[in-house]
């Protein structure tokens, strides 16, 4: 059975994508952002450094929440074993693929902590032509909602999905299911590899619990000011819904 969304403070609803190659750069960003960011996503690039869990430990030591975004996908027994071990670490969110119901059920059963598991639906870099190349000739929103319902039925706690699909997911799954939206573009589209993007206010108005922001903060002239501006926009969006 899916568990209720994490009880997040407003400032924890902004998750910064810590897309860096090593521990030194990761901690440099944490120092630079200070108290403007309370939640960090760490992914595959950092894993390749061999310093992944050192960074995880350091983030926890600094009272930051951690989102492990490694999109686990394997046979059910192997994926469940990974989740069982990962649940021993101070992790708030972790991603698994949302393509395999038996694997999702095994992962949900193996999670023995407060960590919330999020199923990957359709990457925000993909549109309908990309799905068609994979033999799925359907609109992304239809695939995303179908996978969200499958994840919920398997006992997974939520999904990570484009803000464009947050409303349909919330309508289909109800209030007790976590929705985390990456590909957020506070200032509108920026011409990168993200195709299905929305702004901060729209994501929360449509039911998102948290958002992931990377480049709009990382590439800003003043990253801390950019993060604080997003925090203010989140607070306004939450007050309005």
Swiss-Prot record:
Q: Which GO terms describe its biological process?
A: 'de novo' pyrimidine nucleobase biosynthetic process; 'de novo' UMP biosynthetic process
User: What top-level class of enzyme does the UniProt entry assign?
Assistant: lyase
- The record lists the membrane-crossing segments as none
What is known about what this protein does? Catalyzes the decarboxylation of orotidine 5'-monophosphate (OMP) to uridine 5'-monophosphate (UMP).
* Cross-referenced HAMAP family: OMPdecase_type1_B
Describe its assembly: Homodimer.
What is the protein name stated in its UniProt record?
Orotidine 5'-phosphate decarboxylase
């Amino acid at each position: 059975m899916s568990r209720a969304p994490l009880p997040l403070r407003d400032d924890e609803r902004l998750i910064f994508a810590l897309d860096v190659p090593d521990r030194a750069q990761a901690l440099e960003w944490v120092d630079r952002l200070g108290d403007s960011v309370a939640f960090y996503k760490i992914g595959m690039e950092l894993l390749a450094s061999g310093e992944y869990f050192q960074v995880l430990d350091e983030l926890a030591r600094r009272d930051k929440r951690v989102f492990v975004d490694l999109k686990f996908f394997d046979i059910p027994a192997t994926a469940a074993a990974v989740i069982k071990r990962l649940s021993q670490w101070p992790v708030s969110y972790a991603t698994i693929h949302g393509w395999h119901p038996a694997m999702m059920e095994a992962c949900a059963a193996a999670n023995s902590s407060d960590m919330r598991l999020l199923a990957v639906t359709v990457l925000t870099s993909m549109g309908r032509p990309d799905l068609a190349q994979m033999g799925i000739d359907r609109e992304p929103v239809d695939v995303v909602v179908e996978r969200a319902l499958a994840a919920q039925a398997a006992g997974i706690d939520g999904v990570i999905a484009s803000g464009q699909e947050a409303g349909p997911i919330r309508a289909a799954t109800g209030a007790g299911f976590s929705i985390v939206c990456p590909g957020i573009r506070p200032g509108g589209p920026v011409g990168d590899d993200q195709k299905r993007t929305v702004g901060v206010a729209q994501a929360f108005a449509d039911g998102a619990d948290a958002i992931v922001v990377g480049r709009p903060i990382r590439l800003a002239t003043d990253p801390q000011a950019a993060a604080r501006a997003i925090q203010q926009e989140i607070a306004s969006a939450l007050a309005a819904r």
